[in-house]
Amino acid sequence: MKTTRTTFFTRDKNFYKTFFRLMLVVALQNLVAYSVNMLDNIMLGSYSQDALSGAATVNQIFFIVNQLALSIGNALVAICSQYWGKQETEEIRKLTGAALALSILIAAVVVTACTCMPERLLGIFTTSPEIIAEGKAYLGLLKWTFLLFMISNLLIAMLRSVEVVKISFVISVVSLITNGCINYTLIFGHFGFPEMGIKGAAVGTLTARMLELLIIVVYVWKIDTKVRLFDVNLIRIIFAPENRKIWRAFLKVAFPIMCSGMIWAISVPMQTAILGHLSADAIAANSVSSTFFQYLKVIVIAISSASAVVIGKDIGEGDIERVKSDGRTLSVMDLLIGVVLASLLFVLRGPLLSMYKLTDTAAVLADHFIMIMSIVMVGMSYQMPVSVGVIQGGGDTKFSMYMNLISTWGIVMPLSFLAAFVWKLPVELVVAAVQSDQLFKGIPVFLRFRSYKWIHKLT
């Protein structure tokens, strides 16, 4: 690697232009995607409680699929962004082919399981026969979206690694409009169409996913052809014996990221179960406060995605001092953005809560929860972009896996269980315990970042 002398913080205007362009578009894409899920919940909630609960149960399965898809996509970005820095698009093509084959294999396994034992899978999350029946009807169609989503997400990740992001926002908007229109028509039976209930929601989601995949395939095939992904010999390249090293290189990066994602994904239902044993007022307050928190979290995730591309490209270009300078700049910006987001959440909590009809007790608890989450937002806005964006994007994929394993299952889950069921602490402290990892993760993340041992050349 080159060791060009640079300033402590980068002064390269192109760095800031690239970072904020990537961050803004990815944030808008994620915001629209999150709104799609909210729209489904609102419409199904207006139709029937069992339909809403059935869809929520199926979404627990999709949550696992989503984490696997994101993990594979993040692994692809970590390697391909370095190749993009070297302008070696043929290697990006080979890696994308390997990642695509892995995504299809995982999706096929999940779809097969959903086909062969839907009741058993849904029974993991609920014992209600009514909810399982609704969930089975929903899953019958929705399972096919798992395959479509994993392919689309993988192609979007590949484009992000070469700094192409606008198409992902366009796709999300088209998906939102398509899903919303079909849901309105088929869930309730408007405009002469049959009233299909939860099956109508499944049709809307499936149609939107099919349209997403069609748009991204046409875009990669005919419009943005720098990677030439869909050449006729793609299948041969994926399985060619001489390209086994590509598979090994990808799996070496992808496996720790997938493990890290699963460590976190499995903990989420358990955290939900702990909070679900609180009072009805506390559950309602947590639901409201979490909604606002999730909208701001979209920005933090976008910062992580943009950081991974910028750092990976820097490493691919081979200037180690620039990698350090850009990393320092990103880490400070992450903290400052976190303070801004936390301040917004804290200051606007009154007007936001006024939109909901809550009991007096629930309103007070929601106010307290948002204050807690404002503090959490500062920690999360630093540790997530630095650990996932800078460190993982810099090629160190094992650090986050070990950190999540220790923090989630060694500290947060036991602490949350003790706070809720043994010590019987006030609900505010239980919520603080559940979210506490977002704060103390900052210490190992800072120490790892300052060591610069995360700079790994993967190409």
What are these regions (language model features)?
Residues 1-26, 80-147, 194-254, 311-377, ...:
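Short alpha-helical transmembrane segments in multi-pass integral membrane proteins
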Residues 52-112, 149-168, 272, 283-349, ...:
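Small-residue-rich hydrophobic transmembrane alpha-helices
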Residues 26, 30, 41-42, 78, ...:
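Transmembrane alpha-helix boundary and packing residues in multipass membrane permease domains
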Residues 33, 37-40, 44, 66-73, ...:
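Alpha-helical transmembrane segments and their lipid-water interface positions
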